[in-house]
UniProtKB/Swiss-Prot annotation:
Coiled coil: none annotated. It is a multi-pass membrane protein. The modification N-acetylthreonine is found at T2. Belongs to the reaction center PufL/M/PsbA/D family. Pheophytin a binds at Q130, N143. PSII is composed of 1 copy each of membrane proteins PsbA, PsbB, PsbC, PsbD, PsbE, PsbF, PsbH, PsbI, PsbJ, PsbK, PsbL, PsbM, PsbT, PsbX, PsbY, PsbZ, Psb30/Ycf12, at least 3 peripheral proteins of the oxygen-evolving complex and a large number of cofactors. It forms dimeric complexes. Keywords: Acetylation, Chlorophyll, Chloroplast, Chromophore, Electron transport, Iron, Magnesium, Membrane, Metal-binding, Oxidoreductase, Phosphoprotein, Photosynthesis, Photosystem II, Plastid, Thylakoid, Transmembrane, Transmembrane helix, Transport. Its EC number is 1.10.3.9. The chain crosses the membrane at residues 41-61, 125-141, 153-166, 208-228, 279-295. The gene is psbD. SUPFAM superfamilies: Bacterial photosystem II reaction centre, L and M subunits. Photosystem II (PSII) is a light-driven water:plastoquinone oxidoreductase that uses light energy to abstract electrons from H(2)O, generating O(2) and a proton gradient subsequently used for ATP formation. It consists of a core antenna complex that captures photons, and an electron transfer chain that converts photonic excitation into a charge separation. The D1/D2 (PsbA/PsbD) reaction center heterodimer binds P680, the primary electron donor of PSII as well as several subsequent electron acceptors. D2 is needed for assembly of a stable PSII complex. A plastoquinone binds at H215, F262. It comes from Illicium oligandrum (Star anise). This is Photosystem II D2 protein.
Length: 353
């Protein structure tokens, strides 16, 4: 057996090294390897959205006006989902649907799949950017881990949910009022507010807002060293070595207020990371469940009693009737291709009516 000792030498002008040196060079805007995914995808996603909201109608897919050109404003313009008949087609510009015709591609809803897919990969690229920069400056990757939560929500709502339904048609369109319509749809057809995963998501987001407000106020309240500047932002150097607020004072204050308090800054900040990230991940899992048409809580005994006794009604039974109303009124407008017609007598009315 021969053992070779020595060092493997590469060519001085190795292409990978040249690329690595240029991509990771210290500049005003870091590019990095992740930038090869992030910047093109973000550019195309934003460009597609601005193009769609400015010029493209939704007449052929939803029977709606959805662009500034047709009279919409920022709140009502949208890039709409493709028609239900197109199912889960990727709607490639060169595909069998548009056959290279850009105008026809826009009319069919091709911009929605374009924006959704480039947007998803752009978000993933941004998370990889945080990983790459953290590794470069020897930080731990918790920023990237935290950013995985909004990515999970985006992917579950815009991609996984419609994949579980009959087509991209049932995903949210990219617009403010369009998202509101989608929320009403989720409530009416899935009773989303009574879903335990939605409850965990709300607890995570609102709990994080509360923690953030308490934390910021506590740090401001316990500042003990004043600088010469006119305000907090001018008073201190951002690279100062010493703390200028008192963790001990904050601990004593909240111990008196609540009876318990964080005594360790690592645990405090981990908790502030854990609450919103876990909440968003739970809500994303809930949306995956809705893609499979899993149901929320059902209190059937209350529904049966409400049906038998005109004087018995709970907030739950009222909400169930409201959901039926949303479905009956919304389906005919939201799915015009189904030609749904509901006579007046089948539209739900509560016991009070």
């Amino acid at each position: 057996m021969t053992i070779a000792l020595g060092r493997f030498t590469k060519e001085e002008n190795d292409l990978f090294d040249i690329m690595d040196d240029w991509l990771r060079r210290d500049r005003f805007v870091f590019v990095g390897w992740s930038g090869l995914l992030l910047f093109p995808c973000a550019y195309f996603a934003l460009g597609g959205w601005f193009t769609g909201t400015t010029f493209v109608t939704s007449w052929y897919t939803h029977g709606l006006a959805s662009s500034y050109l047709e009279g919409c404003n920022f709140l009502t313009a949208a890039v709409s989902t493709p028609a239900n008949s197109l199912a889960h087609s990727l709607l490639l510009l060169w595909g069998p649907e548009a056959q290279g015709d850009f105008t026809r591609w826009c009319q069919l809803g091709g911009l929605w799949t374009f924006v959704a897919l480039h947007g998803a990969f752009g978000l993933i690229g941004f998370m990889l950017r945080q990983f790459e920069l953290a590794r470069s400056v020897q930080l731990r990757p918790y920023n990237a881990i935290a950013f995985s939560a909004p990515i999970a929500v985006f992917v579950s709502v815009f991609l996984i949910y419609p994949l579980g339904q009959s087509g991209w048609f049932f995903a949210p369109s990219f617009g403010v009022a369009a998202i509101f319509r989608f929320i009403l749809f989720f409530q009416g057809f899935h009773n989303w507010t009574l879903n335990p995963f939605h409850m965990m998501g709300v607890a995570g987001v609102l709990g994080a807002a509360l923690l953030c407000a308490i934390h910021g106020a506590t740090v401001e309240n316990t500042l003990f060293e004043d600088g010469d500047g006119a305000n907090t932002f001018r008073a201190f150097n951002p690279t100062q070595a010493e703390e200028t607020y008192s963790m001990v004072t904050a601990n004593r204050f909240w111990s008196q207020i609540f009876g318990v308090a964080f005594s360790n800054k690592r645990w405090l900040h981990f908790f502030m990371l854990f609450v919103p990230v876990t909440g968003l991940w739970m809500s994303a899992l809930g949306v995956v469940g809705l893609a499979l048409n899993l149901r929320a809580y059902d209190f059937v005994s209350q529904e049966i009693r409400a049906a038998e006794d005109p004087e018995f009604e709970t907030f739950y039974t009222k909400n169930i009737l409201l959901n039926e109303g949303i479905r009956a009124w919304m389906a005919a407008q939201d799915q015009p291709h189904e030609n749904l017609i509901f006579p007046e007598e089948v539209l739900p009315r509560g016991n009070a009516l």
